[in-house]
Structure formats: structure tokens, C-alpha cells
Amino acid sequence: ERPQGETVKNLIAKIHQELGKLVMADVDSLEAAIEAVEAGADCVGTTLYGYTKATQNQSPPGFDLLSQMVKQLQVPVICEGGISSPEMARKALDLGAHAVVVGTAITGIDLLVKAYQLELSKNL
């Protein structure tokens, strides 16, 4: 349920008309991506893959989803989520991603430091 019962299509139209901005839809499935594009999204990202009830047993990045989206959609597809190495970023681009978002692998240094601390403090 959206605020004031607005549909995604109406929200996207408002963003386009009133703000003159492009809209990226974060999705977890091909079906959601198709719906987003039909509602007017200018691009779609694999951002929610692995983080929703329907995909919680999957681990990002969703390379299979990315490949399907690239083949079936006529808008740019962004690979976002779970990119933890340059090789993974290259694979996403090779599969046809318009762009790749690298987040925690670069900005999450604190998580990496904690993991090292935890492991190295065992049995001391």
C-alpha cells in the first residue's frame, strides 16, 4: 500500500512531470521489473534480489535475474547488490548491465575490520 493509495504508475508519472527526473525501480524478480517498466520506470536495478520474502533464500548478486532482465527489457538494467570483487563487476557488465553499483565492498570497511577482529581474537 502506497501513501494515499497512489499507484506506482501514478508516482512515476508525477516524478516525470513535476520533477523532470528519471526513475529507477529496485526489483527482486523479472516480473517486478516488467511491471516497473510498464509503469514507466526509466531503468531497473537488481537491488532487492535476496532481500525480499520471495528471494530471501537467494544470495546477491542475481546474475541470472540480471541476464533475464537485460534480454527482456528495453531499458537500462543496473546490477546492484552483492558485488564484492572487480571480477563480479566485470561479469555483470559482460552480462549486459548498463552499470554496476558497488556498495558495502567499498564503503563497509568497518564490517571487514570487525570480522578480522572477531576471528583473530578467538582463543587468545
Feature roles, as predicted:
Residues 1-16, 30-35, 51-70, 86-90, ...:
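Active-site-adjacent beta->alpha loops and helix N-cap segments on the catalytic face
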Residues 3, 24, 57, 80-81:
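Residues that cap or flank secondary-structure elements
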Residues 14-28, 71-80:
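Short beta-strand/loop segments at the ligand-binding rim of alpha/beta enzyme cores
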Residues 17-20, 42, 67, 71-74, ...:
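Generic secondary-structure signature for well-ordered alpha-helical cores
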Residues 29-42, 75-79, 83-102:
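Catalytic cores of alpha/beta
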Residues 42-49:
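Non-cysteine beta-strand/loop elements that form the S-adenosyl-L-methionine
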Residues 49, 98, 105-106:
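Flexible glycine-rich beta->alpha loop in the catalytic core of nucleotide-sugar glycosyltransferases
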